[in-house]
């Protein structure tokens, strides 16, 4: 490389052209003589990786052929070098700018030829695919089969259920041990089983496993590490006579007795929770609060006794959580052993396994790490705010060599936006955006992109009005949250092509009116008829699918980009599941009766045995896809958009099963029962999806639906548990699953940790809503629940009269 480049960190707000800037960097490297095979560009989705390659080829072709494009590139890079203080690079590009256009274009032609000749060695892909390449490249050294492959999501769900079985077997045949495992994973403090126990068990274990890998050496449920100064102790006070209670507090002693008998799994009444809320004052001997809607003061021994009972309750729940955390740590350790055995035997990996294997078994092994070090000289990392600690741990030893380069011959370039860090729930850590450069600040240049090329000026004005730090201060958000948000705020300026453009409005609706309102908006705007795009964003897949059904009934074409179990959809999904059951067991009368009464009744018109025989024959000749196409040929779905889309989903299920290597109809029946369909985009259709799924996309009309209900809160600081946390005290690193808010508030160390949970929740929700609002190109509509007036709020059930739980 003829001149030096700097390491570069770019902070890019939504719609400001980070892909453009990243491909500029790749073109720059190519024009400076870097071989394509020495460049590594990583992002998080295959779609984004494909976009990189497409934009790169377009940029090289334009520079090679279009008048003035090569000169514009050199001038752009010259100005950027000047702004960054890179004088040598600025002089280099100034000389390029002065050269004849024919010579400028020739440089681009040479770079384009170099890329096309070496296209198969150009590494532009996802972070997961790169980690997989690392693992597969050293499979023999890792004790893995060379045919190692990554499970797709449907196959991974089957794998996880089998892993649970292996884990239970490893823990022993004792029924009590198995019952304890189940209680730990799905019972929790509330004693309430989730709607889908298996999926809940898997999620709980996966979170424990992730932290177990990220926190090596931490003590799980270590009381000494978490509470180095010890926990507050319950006072030794005899029960008083309760003769001098405030007026209207006659049943206060009943609430004290309730708490004395309560423990993990107990649902506390609102009255009993008053003891927790006022525990500090009660323990001190004086507390003033409202009980039975009567304000009063409790003092002396009655107060101290109530405080000691509340403290005893807190101690019981903390002890239970510590024990449960210790068991979760043991499960995570045993789970790692189970996975190692299974992957060495079958060569099947999850995406979540890749960072751990790459870190522990590849980059930490000197011989293997040395072989990796020479792979790439220039690293370009996209969407860096979504990188997890475990992923970075796998890359860091390799990138460390890049940081050490003082000659400018090897570089790191990373881009991100901490305002769009919406994947913390799966391990993404926005703090890495600044942390990884600590110690190398002198070698790193910073660049900010704040000019939006996506959104109309009026849309950006709304974004600023809601999200700029001053607005958050006016809204009285936690000052620590505002300070953290301010660090990542880069502002938003509209490009001149979007000045005075855009439309923003708010519509109020809740319940059944939400989707009627959305349908009206789409029909009024007529964006689809004009060839534009419409995105409707929700917070959950379930709500998106609910909307898809209603909007389809309104005559609108809809596709859902989230994932949903096909077998629960409309009348067709369950009918296909019954068909699979009958193909497996023709003697199943219940399945036969259900099939005759449903959408696939014509398929069994000639009898059950002919149907089963035909299904097996179709499976033998065309796999699961051929079999389900045979079933669907008997269904009358023509003209019904919803059913046509659902039929396509059923076919995708068959195709996915065939690709997973499944070999029998019985296996397909199990597979189909658990299959989560990724959906498909339809031209001229409303694209319904979760906000998470919309990341990286843009729509001419964006409708954001924020709904209440079903456990969903519109509060920014909503902290739905459980929270498995890690930290450090002078006594060492620890891991603990936090108890409920009320219990945490009674213990200083846990109160501080729960406060951090709340701050993280606020930041995560700010990021989520920022992503939602910045998807809009021309029009943004927010559909929100009506604001309840004071009179409406007064009708709500009082906190004392409601049930609570700690």
Task: Kindly give the residue locations of the regions a language model identified.
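Conserved catalytic motifs of ABC-family nucleotide-binding domains
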Residues: 714-756
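Conserved ATP-dependent motor core of P-loop NTPases, especially the RecA-like helicase ATPase domain
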Residues: 1-10, 43, 60-270, 349, ...
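C-terminal accessory regions
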Residues: 604-624, 680-687, 692, 741-805
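Conserved ATP-driven helicase/translocase motor core recognized via long
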Residues: 13, 38, 68, 190-348, ...
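Long, charged, helix-prone linker segments
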Residues: 190, 195, 686, 694-731, ...
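Conserved motor-region signature of P-loop NTPase helicases/translocases
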Residues: 1-54, 58, 152-154, 162, ...
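Conserved helicase/translocase P-loop NTPase motor core
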Residues: 124-131, 156-160, 164, 249-252, ...
